[in-house]
Amino acid sequence: MATGQIFSKTTQALFYNYKQLPIQRMLDFDFLCGRETPSVAGIINPGSDGFQKLFFGQEEIAIPVHPTIEAACNAHPTADVFINFASFRSAAASSMSALKQPTLRVVAIIAEGVPESDAKQLISYARANNKVIIGPATVGGVQAGAFKIGDTAGTIDNIIQCKLYRPGSVGFVSKSGGMSNELYNTIARVTDGIYEGIAIGGDVFPGSTLSDHILRFNNIPQVKMMVVLGELGGSDEYSLVEALKQGKVQKPVVAWVSGTCARLFKSEGAKSGGELESAQSKNQALRDAGAVVPTSFEALESVIKETFEKLVEEGNIPPVPEVTPPLIPEDLNTAIKSGKVRAPTHIISTISDDRGEEPCYAGVPMSTIIERGYGVGDVISLLWFKRSLPRYCTQFIEICVMLCADHGPCVSGAHNSIVTARAGKDLVSSLVSGLLTIGPRFGGAIDDAARYFKDAYDRGLTPYEFVEGMKKKGIRVPGIGHRIKSRDNRDKRVQLLQKYAHAHFPSVKYMEYAVQVETYTLSKANNLVMNVDGAIGSLFLDLLSGSGMFSKQEIDEIIEIGYLNGLFVLARSIGLIGHTFDQKRLKQPLYRHPWEDVLYTK
């Protein structure tokens, strides 16, 4: 491995398995360091493509999303770092795929628990092809002022405190990702800061070793000293001992192998397998090889400070110019939660709330709806009228839904849905095709019937005055008239609704007025009977006014908005869906209207 610097201020990465927070932290670090281009060139999310919106400073940017590693590499040939956030189950396969890409030279594997056999194969391939693996089980790495991997170094506040926004003179490598944050802070306090920091990961077989990175740091002119933090267990530290003994490292190395707190990290590499793998043996071996090893972890900070100050006195470390990092704009959601800003909302909702443990309809929890045995009518009363209506009202709503659910295949709505379904269209297209026929001539006259009946009754018009007045205006009376029903063949649905209302409603004044209008219109023509639109419209007026739960203004608003037509739309959707399923189940062919049923004329 050896060689030298693996990251720079122009390094770009491909990020595998989209994770919003680590990517945003990388972009925030970029902005903090004054990078001109984002360090994340593309995202790989298997099976997906498109873009993900993230922030680069104050500017919102769109980062391309690719379905495969190959597609991402082809689209971003200058991106040479692969950051793998796959789970341990798929980390090995995706990492091997990345290693085989000619444009990628560094692969960081974040997942813990990668099988040892898979790790060995990855390491073997990487070494044979001059690639660098960081991990598995790593938090990543950082080159101060240039590039960082994922969640390395934590929050922006911690990065600023550790002065990672500009390069220092110390190369740092550790097994533990958790302890690396602590050491970044320590090093920033007593030196001019980190130049590069790497956490190799705590698994038994790391993709790159402590000595790999120390030898690499030794070749980087800007790195003047190195700090190593090892753990008991394994033999990785002994390769560093050999490198020191052989004189391969010419720069000061401060080292400590942690033994007392390794159990807290529970990493695979921290399992001691004998005396040679103990922290005491490793520390002594490093000390004997020429590393500066403190007597305890608590003394590590002072030893780092002494080593750095000695280099400064010898003139080996020029002063690092301090820079003031730019302020990272705070996310709106974070600022709102902290009470720092207020922002207007874009949608107002008063009928439901899904922010708690369970959705609430008009303030009624879902569990209450189920426990109390509420029906569809009760749910409609909550979501449409924002109140719990009496049972006779909600039962009337349910009756309307049942009676209007379907009226055979010959009416315009069902016909359209059938034709659309037979054309091979999907359920939603077939449903909408039928719904779009609902209007003044088919099912959409309920609101108008209620509107005109209410106006006439409230103004005290006689049926004669009402009907003749509508005639003079050239307006047909909504809710009156039927294509197949007549005086002698009444609509059974109308009769059922009227029967229910007589038995349960406290008042049926609007329905009685509509019946009087029907009596007058029947004197003109045998088919001018009350239809289901007229029955529902007049009876809904009686429901709204008789329940005592609505003001006159609310009733007028309900009719004006179109609530009552909504009832027909809801009900008839059941039948239209049924006709669609029926045609598909019967595997009916494309419909073509027969010639003999068309009058061809000039």
Question: Across the structure, where does each feature detected by a protein language model lie?
Answer:
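Catalytic-core regions of core metabolic enzymes
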Residues: M1-T334
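Non-transmembrane, aqueous-exposed alpha-helical and coiled segments at domain scale
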Residues: P326-K602
